[in-house]
Every structure is written in structure tokens, then in C-alpha cells.
């Protein structure tokens, strides 16, 4: 199914891979081959060429955006004739980047690459990364509410906690704690947190970070997660391609992490290859695909930038929202 944007109607300017790569200009490569290898996700090959042609131009763009936002913040502080009490001690407001997209599309890899590249720019030396997985409701609550089969859907998150976290980040409070999630145990870890302390940039990666709800009829303001973003990226791909990525990842996990008896998914390691593939397809088509079509994909148009991938996890096209 072709879901590419109609250039005649789109609020985006779309670039071919070659056109986008040319926008790197003289941006230097700041990552070594071994560092790039360590940034790869499970089943997501990341080449030096991909970083040079896709992510270096994007890091250059983001560096310009961050510098402009910092300048705007200083102008606002000057206008108010006082240092904003919500600013960090150095007069900077954390710049927040959202990364959205389907399960298995490569969000985490994109987020890690951006974190590594942006931390090399002189005006943003401290770049932190959190995933919204930590803001999922604990399994005990999901089971009690009958939501285990809806894990990853908007209703499975502790939205007030996530909004409070982002509010504290934007207010410059320190440190701010985000709950820690374990994919091994498939649950939020009790009393375990990651501390975020005055980053120049915070990258927030998750399925539904661009999600909105219907506004109330009384006009009361309801914040969305994306209201706190200064820039957002959506990782796109055709459903049949993402399905293949999901199944391939499931099969790799079956042969590795799932073999540990303590793993939440250990039972899947006992399946035959045919049974495992059938199980992966069932999970994808029964849970992840409906979530993609009903909740994730409709938010694509809210992103500032869309990276459209081909079957080998290579970006073929980039769409940048017009100013």
C-alpha cells in the first residue's frame, strides 16, 4: 500500500536520498565505525553511508534549530526584563526532540544515532535519551484492567506521569526521574529510575508520542505530549515491510534473549521455527498492526520530519515540514 505524501497537497518539502545527502555540506563525520556498530538495533544494520547521507544532514539541521531556539529564548528573557525563573542556571531551556513510529521500525536506533551526533556539536554537549516504555502502566495494573493485549496502545500509559515529567524538564527542574522499563522482564521496574539532569537536548522516543485526543467542548486546555516537543521525527515504512522486520526481530530474540529462563518470553524459545513465525505474525496482526493503523500512523502528519524507510532499513526519502 503506497502511503507517500502527495507533493501537491503536502505541507512538507520532500527530498530524495541524494538531495538530502547534499545538505550535509561540510558537516564532519564525528563517529568511528565501531561507534556506529554499537548504535545498531536488533536486526537494524546501520552503515557509515547511512549516517553520512541521512543522519549527518539531520544533525546539522537540528543544530541550527537548537541554536535558533536558544537565541529566541534569550530574546524572550530580555523582553521580560528578567531571567526566566523556569530556565536552567545557564539560561538555557532544554530542547526536546520526539521520535515516533511503529514497533520494529527502528525508532531506538534513530534516537541513539541522533543522541551520539548531537552530543558532538559544541552548543549541545549534553544529550539525554528516554523512552516512553518506562511510562507504561505496570503489568499488574494492565492485567487488572484487562489491558495486557493493549500494551503499547495509548490507554496503557501513565499519561499524567509522562506529562509531569516533561513539564519538569521544560521548567528546568533538576534532577528529573523517569521510570525504568525492562524488555527482558516486559515490565516497569519497581523503584528503579533514570535521572535526567539539565540536558541541552532531551530525545523522547516512543510509539505514541505524537498522539492527541479530541479537545473538550468547553475549550479547557488539555496538554499533549507533543506540546512539549521543539522538533519531532516520524519513522515511516510500509506495513508489510514493518511486519517482516517484526517477525525477523522476534525470531532473533527467540534464539537469544528468550532462551534465558528468567525472560518473560522464555516460553517462545521452546517453539519450533514454524510455530514461532506463526506466533510472531499473530502478535503483529492482532496487536501491533491495529495499534499502528489506529493510533500511530494517524500521527505521522504531526511530525516535523518524516524518514521513509525501504525494506533494508535504509532511508529512501525525507519529508521536512515547511516553515
Curated annotation (Swiss-Prot):
Pfam families: PRK. Its EC number is 2.7.1.33. Keywords: ATP-binding, Coenzyme A biosynthesis, Cytoplasm, Kinase, Nucleotide-binding, Transferase. SUPFAM superfamilies: P-loop containing nucleoside triphosphate hydrolases. One of its GO terms (cellular component) is cytoplasm. CDD domains: PanK. It catalyses: (R)-pantothenate + ATP = (R)-4'-phosphopantothenate + ADP + H(+). Pathway: Cofactor biosynthesis; coenzyme A biosynthesis; CoA from (R)-pantothenate: step 1/5. GO terms for molecular function: ATP binding; pantothenate kinase activity. InterPro entries: P-loop_NTPase, PanK, PRK/URK. It is found in: Cytoplasm. ATP binds at residues 101-108. GO terms for biological process: coenzyme A biosynthetic process. Belongs to the prokaryotic pantothenate kinase family. NCBIfam families: panK_bact. This is Pantothenate kinase. It comes from Xanthobacter autotrophicus (strain ATCC BAA-1158 / Py2).
Amino acid at each position: 500500500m503506497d502511503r507517500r505524501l502527495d507533493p501537491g497537497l503536502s505541507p512538507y518539502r520532500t527530498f530524495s536520498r541524494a538531495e538530502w545527502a547534499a545538505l550535509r555540506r561540510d558537516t564532519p563525520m564525528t563517529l568511528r565505525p565501531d561507534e556506529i556498530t554499537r548504535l545498531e538495533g536488533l536486526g537494524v544494520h546501520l552503515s557509515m553511508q547511512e549516517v553520512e547521507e541521512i543522519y549527518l544532514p539531520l544533525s546539522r539541521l537540528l543544530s541550527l534549530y537548537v541554536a535558533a531556539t536558544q537565541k529566541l529564548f534569550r530574546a524572550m528573557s530580555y523582553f521580560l526584563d528578567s531571567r526566566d525563573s523556569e530556565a536552567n542556571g545557564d539560561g538555557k531551556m532544554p530542547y526536546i526532540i520526539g521520535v515516533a513510529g511503529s514497533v520494529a521500525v527502528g525508532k531506538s536506533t534513530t534516537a541513539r544515532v541522533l543522541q551520539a551526533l548531537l552530543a558532538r556539536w559544541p552548543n549541545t554537549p549534553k544529550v539525554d535519551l528516554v523512552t516512553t516504555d518506562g511510562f507504561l502502566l505496570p503489568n499488574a495494573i494492565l492485567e487488572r484492567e484487562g489491558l495486557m493485549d493493549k500494551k503499547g496502545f495509548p490507554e496503557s500509559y501513565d499519561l499524567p506521569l509522562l506529562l509531569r515529567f516533561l513539564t519538569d524538564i521544560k521548567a528546568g527542574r533538576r534532577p528529573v526521574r523517569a521510570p525504568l522499563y525492562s524488555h527482558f522482564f516486559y515490565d516497569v521496574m519497581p523503584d528503579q529510575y533514570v535521572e535526567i539532569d539539565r540536558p541541552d537536548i532531551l530525545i523522547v522516543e516512543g510509539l505514541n508520542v505524537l498522539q492527541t485526543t479530541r479537545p473538550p467542548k468547553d475549550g479547557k486546555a488539555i496538554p499533549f505530549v507533543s506540546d512539549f516537543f521543539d522538533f519531532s521525527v516520524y519513522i515511516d515504512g510500509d506495513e508489510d515491510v514493518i511486519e517482516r522486520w517484526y517477525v525477523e526481530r522476534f525470531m532473533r530474540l527467540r534464539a537469544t534473549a528468550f532462551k534465558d529462563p528468567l525472560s518473560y518470553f522464555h516460553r517462545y524459545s521452546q517453539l519450533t521455527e514454524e510455530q514461532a513465525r506463526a506466533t510472531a505474525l499473530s502478535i503483529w496482526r492482532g496487536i501491533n498492526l491495529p495499534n499502528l493503523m489506529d493510533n500511530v500512523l494517524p500521527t505521522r502528519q504531526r511530525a516535523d520530519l518524516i524518514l521513509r524507510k525501504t525494506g533494508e532499513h535504509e532511508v529512501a526519502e525525507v519529508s521536512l515540514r515547511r516553515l
